[in-house]
Protein backbone atom coordinates (compact mmCIF):
# COMPACT_ATOMS: atom_id res chain seq x y z
CA UNK A 1 0.00 0.00 0.00
CA UNK A 2 1.31 3.44 -0.92
CA UNK A 3 1.67 6.11 1.72
CA UNK A 4 0.06 9.48 1.21
CA UNK A 5 1.83 12.80 0.70
CA UNK A 6 0.29 16.17 1.43
CA UNK A 7 1.34 19.79 1.21
CA UNK A 8 0.09 22.57 3.50
CA UNK A 9 0.47 26.26 2.76
CA UNK A 10 -1.10 29.28 1.16
CA UNK A 11 -3.24 28.58 -1.89
CA UNK A 12 -0.85 30.09 -4.43
CA UNK A 13 2.07 28.02 -3.15
CA UNK A 14 0.39 24.62 -2.93
CA UNK A 15 -1.81 24.37 -6.01
CA UNK A 16 1.07 23.44 -8.32
CA UNK A 17 1.64 20.26 -6.29
CA UNK A 18 -1.77 18.98 -7.36
CA UNK A 19 -0.37 18.37 -10.86
CA UNK A 20 2.14 15.98 -9.27
CA UNK A 21 -0.61 13.95 -7.63
CA UNK A 22 0.09 15.31 -4.16
CA UNK A 23 -2.87 16.14 -1.94
CA UNK A 24 -2.98 19.91 -1.39
CA UNK A 25 -4.35 21.68 1.66
CA UNK A 26 -4.51 25.46 1.29
CA UNK A 27 -4.77 27.15 4.68
CA UNK A 28 -5.38 30.65 5.98
CA UNK A 29 -4.16 31.34 9.49
CA UNK A 30 -2.20 29.46 12.12
CA UNK A 31 -5.14 27.64 13.72
CA UNK A 32 -6.28 26.20 10.41
CA UNK A 33 -2.69 25.16 9.62
CA UNK A 34 -2.30 23.39 12.99
CA UNK A 35 -5.58 21.54 12.57
CA UNK A 36 -4.68 20.53 9.02
CA UNK A 37 -1.26 19.13 9.96
CA UNK A 38 -2.81 17.24 12.89
CA UNK A 39 -5.54 15.86 10.60
CA UNK A 40 -2.96 14.66 8.06
CA UNK A 41 -0.95 12.93 10.78
CA UNK A 42 -4.06 11.14 12.04
CA UNK A 43 -5.00 10.12 8.48
CA UNK A 44 -1.73 8.25 7.90
CA UNK A 45 0.09 10.72 5.69
CA UNK A 46 3.74 9.66 5.55
CA UNK A 47 5.10 13.00 4.31
CA UNK A 48 3.68 16.45 4.96
CA UNK A 49 5.30 19.37 3.19
CA UNK A 50 4.66 22.71 4.91
CA UNK A 51 5.61 26.06 3.44
CA UNK A 52 8.13 27.99 5.52
CA UNK A 53 5.80 30.97 5.88
CA UNK A 54 3.09 28.76 7.39
CA UNK A 55 5.60 26.85 9.52
CA UNK A 56 6.70 30.08 11.21
CA UNK A 57 3.28 30.35 12.84
CA UNK A 58 2.99 26.71 13.95
CA UNK A 59 6.47 25.95 15.25
CA UNK A 60 5.24 23.92 18.25
CA UNK A 61 3.19 21.66 15.96
CA UNK A 62 6.15 21.15 13.62
CA UNK A 63 8.46 20.33 16.56
CA UNK A 64 5.95 17.85 17.99
CA UNK A 65 5.98 15.84 14.76
CA UNK A 66 9.77 16.08 14.43
CA UNK A 67 9.95 13.75 17.43
CA UNK A 68 7.77 11.16 15.67
CA UNK A 69 8.72 8.72 12.92
CA UNK A 70 5.67 9.58 10.83
CA UNK A 71 4.70 11.85 9.35
CA UNK A 72 7.92 13.36 8.12
CA UNK A 73 7.26 17.11 8.15
CA UNK A 74 9.42 18.86 5.59
CA UNK A 75 9.58 22.62 5.21
CA UNK A 76 9.61 24.03 1.70
CA UNK A 77 9.81 27.57 0.32
CA UNK A 78 6.57 29.26 -0.64
CA UNK A 79 6.00 31.08 -3.91
CA UNK A 80 7.09 34.23 -2.03
CA UNK A 81 10.62 32.88 -1.66
CA UNK A 82 12.61 31.06 0.96
CA UNK A 83 13.23 31.97 4.58
CA UNK A 84 16.04 29.36 4.76
CA UNK A 85 14.27 27.64 7.64
CA UNK A 86 14.02 24.32 5.80
CA UNK A 87 17.67 24.32 4.78
CA UNK A 88 18.73 25.19 8.33
CA UNK A 89 16.72 22.25 9.67
CA UNK A 90 18.35 19.90 7.16
CA UNK A 91 21.77 21.23 8.13
CA UNK A 92 21.01 20.76 11.84
CA UNK A 93 19.80 17.19 11.29
CA UNK A 94 22.88 16.28 9.23
CA UNK A 95 25.13 17.72 11.92
CA UNK A 96 23.27 15.78 14.60
CA UNK A 97 23.57 12.56 12.58
CA UNK A 98 27.25 12.75 11.61
CA UNK A 99 28.64 15.00 14.32
CA UNK A 100 29.80 17.78 12.01
CA UNK A 101 28.16 20.16 9.57
CA UNK A 102 29.10 18.87 6.12
CA UNK A 103 26.74 21.17 4.27
Swiss-Prot record:
Gene Ontology molecular functions: ATP binding; proton-transporting ATP synthase activity, rotational mechanism; proton-transporting ATPase activity, rotational mechanism
Pfam families: ATP-synt_F (PF01990)
Top-level lineage group: Bacteria
Any single biological process term in GO: proton motive force-driven plasma membrane ATP synthesis
InterPro entries, per the entry: ATPase_V1-cplx_f_g_su (IPR008218), ATPase_V1-cplx_fsu_bac/arc (IPR022944), ATPase_V1_fsu_sf (IPR036906)
Keyword terms of this UniProt record: ATP synthesis, Hydrogen ion transport, Ion transport, Transport
Record's function text: Produces ATP from ADP in the presence of a proton gradient across the membrane.
Family annotation (HAMAP family): ATP_synth_F_arch (MF_00312)
Family (UniProt): Belongs to the V-ATPase F subunit family.
Protein known as: V-type ATP synthase subunit F
UniProt organism field: Clostridium botulinum (strain Eklund 17B / Type B)
Taxonomic placement: Bacteria, Bacillati, Bacillota, Clostridia, Eubacteriales
Gene: atpF
